[in-house]
Design a protein with these regions (language model features):
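Short glycine/proline- and charge-enriched loop/turn segments
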Residues: 70-80, 123-128
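Conserved SAM-binding loop
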Residues: 1-73, 83-100, 172-177
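N-terminal start-of-chain detector that recognizes signal peptides
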Residues: 27, 58-60, 78, 142-148
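A C-terminal cap/extension of S-adenosyl-L-methionine-dependent methyltransferases
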Residues: 110-177
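A broadly tuned preference for mixed-charge, low-complexity surface segments
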Residues: 17-19, 23, 42-45, 84, ...
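Short leucine-rich amphipathic alpha-helices used at interfaces
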Residues: 65, 71-72, 77, 148, ...
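Short, surface-exposed, polar/charged, turn-prone segments marking secondary-structure boundaries
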Residues: 15-17, 81-86, 116, 133-138
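A SAM-dependent methyltransferase catalytic signature shared across enzymes that methylate proteins
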Residues: 91-111, 144-150
Length: 177
């Protein structure tokens, strides 16, 4: 009803439509690529229009809370997951990748830092029951803030986490320049 022209394409055929787009969204994609920089360059050069919007969501790996939780509980680096995950990102590395390749980041936010539960003493890694319990607590945290009309604080919190390099996921909003 909004007259939106949207296409879904695999990375191997990004420009199959031989057209440019205003928005490209890559949610949990970049970490699966062997050469994420090549894909970002292709999007910048051939897929997005000038001033087009690129939205990327990736796991925030090797963050300080994750590493501290690993050390506290003497865990392996559970987030290293080949062959599925081939590339790993932090807020700094994601920012550098995009800025180096012709994008200006105008917003970055993180998601709830689940690794805090490890630091609280709840060893959820490898424990699906406890993992589900921790996930429910995160959901309740967000729902309760929203019910109290504190969404602005929640979003500011997630932006601050991204600035600190913390949070489970990173979502980046960048404009092609």
């Amino acid at each position: 009803s909004k007259n939106i022209n949207a296409k879904v394409a695999g990375l191997e055929s990004m420009n199959v439509f031989n057209m440019k787009f205003d928005i490209v969204s890559m949610i949990n994609v970049l970490e699966h690529l062997p050469d994420p920089e090549f894909v970002i360059k292709e999007i910048q050069s051939h897929v997005l229009r000038k001033n087009g919007l690129l939205i990327i969501d990736v796991p925030n790996e090797f963050n300080d809370f994750q590493v501290a939780g690993k050390e506290v509980h003497n865990l392996n680096e559970w987030w290293i997951a080949p062959p599925g995950h081939l590339s790993y990102f932090s807020s700094t590395s994601l920012r550098n990748l995009l800025e180096k390749n012709g994008f200006e980041i105008f917003k970055m936010e993180a998601s709830f830092p689940l690794e805090m539960f490890l630091l609280f003493g709840e060893k959820y890694v490898g424990d699906p029951i406890l993992g589900k319990s921790c996930h429910k607590k995160r959901i309740n945290f967000e729902l309760n803030l929203k019910k109290q009309a504190k969404e602005d604080k929640l979003y500011a919190f997630y932006e601050a986490l991204a600035e600190l390099g913390l949070g489970r996921q990173l979502r980046c909003y960048a404009r092609k320049i």
